[in-house]
Amino acid sequence: MATILLQAAGAMLGGVLGPVGSAIGSAAGALAGYAIDRALIDSTRHVEGPRLTGARPFTAEEGASIPRVYGSVRLGGTLIWATRFEETRTTKRQGSKGGPRVTEYSYFANAAFALCEGEIAGIRRIWADGREIDRNDVEIRIYRGSEDQPVDPLIEAKQGSGNAPAYRGLAYVVLDRFALADYGNRIPQFQFEILRPIGETAKQVRAVCLIPGATEYGLSPRLITQQKRPGDSSAANRHVLHAGTDLAASLDELQMLCPNLEHVALVATWFGNDLRAGQCKIRPMVTSRTSSGFSEAWTVSGVGVNAAVAVSWSGEGPAYGGTPSDRSIMAAIREIKARGLKVTLYPFVMMDVAADNTLPDPYGGTAQAPYPWRGRITSDPAPMRPGTADRTDAARSQVSAFCGMALRTQFATTADTVLFTGAPDDWGYRRFLLHFAHLAAAAGGVDAFLIGTELKGLTTLRDQNDGFPFVETLCALASDVRVILGANTAITYGADWSEYFGYHPADGSGDVYFHLDALWAHPAIDAVGIDNYMALSDWRDGDYSGPNPDGFREPYDSAGLRDAIAGGEGYDWYYASEEGRLRRERSPITDGAYGKPWVYRYKDLVGWWSNRHYNRAGGAEAQTSTAWVARSKPIWFTELVCPAVDKGPNQPNVFPDPKSVESAVPYFSSGGRSDLAQRRFLEAHARHWNPASADFNDADNPVSPLYGGRMVDMSRIYLWAWDARPFPAFPLRTDVWSDGDNCFHILTEIAENRSSRVSDRGRNRESSTVTTWSCVRVR
């Protein structure tokens, strides 16, 4: 009506100006009238969106089979319980104040799906209609199928107390108010990635090392975002949808798969830049000094990203990830402790020596080896090189320069970092170690702390009096760390397997020095730490057709591997040269002078641990023993594993890394993947050291009369390594992490048993031979 009236009025008024004015006035009046009409009419109009006129029924399958899962399997679920859809209505006015009121309807489902026979470890990913869902956006409760699992509270609330089953022995999930709008207001087709480890290996894991230590934000349990440009931001530490951050996803899965886990060694890296001890600086580094836009600033030891040194490049990207920010390490410590686990802080040195470096080589090369092992840091020139500094006062001076002058009192803690108040250019080993000790204290303390690992080239350096200056520094650091962290933190050093038991210089002198005994006996040291990468086999492909001299029937013979833990190479015999290894010319390990072959047997832990130690200068045994007290402290394996590669037990200490001089595959290996190699290696160690093992021999791991525990503390066998980058993002996302192809060190036999999915409806495949497949058995 307003349209007609105002149109006529506009035409009349515009007619004063002639026909054109009348037309314009009519149009203007019509528009104004239309607006008034719409406001009057729409203000009372009510529009309703689509609404379900009836239930969309979905049914359970009567008599459906219940699968039994082995390994990692993607399965659909069977509906076992549901309610009617919940309907919610939302009314709001559209447009301006005079717009219509619109009511929209949303629907939510409450349902339970049976998965498989329990007990499973857990569920990793979930798909709805083939698309992975973000677990942060939905409420899903997972029941693993134990025989004592409780009734779900939602089912009990709907069915009434005492009327709801717990579905014990059945793994199932409950969806609580699952939004259906994205699925056409229907229940989508769900699939679940179910984890159920095979065998007992995962249940025996009580300690792991958590890597990578080189990741600027990867250890943060909080979501870190980076804004590259206005309106364009992405997560820096979340590459999966089944947890809020990469670290959370990794720790969730670790605890699912290893129910008896107690200890996590948190690896955190600073970088060395030179193999010459006197020139080497150890400092935090970043992947790029121009990185910006992060929701949390990167700071380490008071150094910001713009002031830090960037790691070198290898190929098309950084050779390493950067040092974890101080704040991320403190947060990671708190997160791990909040999960009921104990933290061992593991300060780690990686060597950033680029392939195109021109640094003088202490070992006599034209340049230093690219990206070397930290155990190569030594004097300049190195021992047994012409003009060596070893066994001179220059060795002590170079070690002193390497360690620096930092004092434990020169650190100040803030909420996000630990500041160093000493000389700004002091990037010595003492600053590095004491920084982490103060960081641990700022995070509320840790259960254990390592004051170093595998610094063999430094611990064996001697001064002019045949003293070991770096060992003295480690002793002093142990005392400092004890003051910082208190009596409740265990302290040790992770010695290389070829380092822990003594130093036997290959110079024909006959010298034997138990060079680390001053450290092992030190009152601030609680355990003897060993990175155990001792070989357990000597298998070649030719042994398939001829007898293996060690009685192995196959490359990973279970009995043979177990016997070799205290036998074989490094115990009964050794190879005097690589040529001798090729020809299998074995030399027996003996001690004709004093009848103590354990002195030379790096595998004879019982002999080394149970006896007093006497140095031999020039081959003559000293009259007095070292400071070591027999059976006085437990042994921890601060690292233990063999790579998941063909013939891994032949040489467990090597891993492929194309950029590094250390890159190698085990002796006589094809380089192909073998998860079975790692599995059998770990099983052999578990049977040998664990008193609960059926074939345990008490003499292999005796009890100390001094502290009442076993020689090797089973709870402190730290397996190397569990990755904080969760599967499947790592190793598949090579656009994010360049080392995805080098993941042979990951604990594959704990993390996965995957390659193909096998369905067995006719035969029972529960035998121990099921190792590398994901299987489903239907009953």
Per-region residue spans from a language model:
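Polar, S/T/G-rich
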Residues: 2-4, 23, 27-219, 229-236
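Acidic, His- and aromatic-enriched active-site or binding-groove loops in soluble protein domains
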Residues: 363-395, 470-480, 484, 514-515, ...
